[in-house]
């Protein structure tokens, strides 16, 4: 089993697919994704659908773009002029995808490593880090 860690996919399905092919990604491998799965690239919908299907292999933490998407879906934010979320927001399964995405963590710990999107807030204690990471 191999573990691959990537960050900031940002809706770039074609590039993610090509990279996984180049890595010869297998069913027994793990894909660690350090947030920002959506927005900026053209295929946020494909990225989320594929990663949801890979739920047993993918270890995901949320990034600011993912949180922005969730805030749009569940209220509180509007899509901005630079957002590339129109296809995703108009998808018939957008709510299912959003509910799946919001179950992902802000940090993940495994194999002796801790993964976050952009560091750890100073107000979090080590106990909280450990507690949240163990919340698998």
Locate the predicted segments by residue:
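A short, hydrophobic C-terminal helix/tail in secreted or cell-surface proteins
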Residues: 132-136
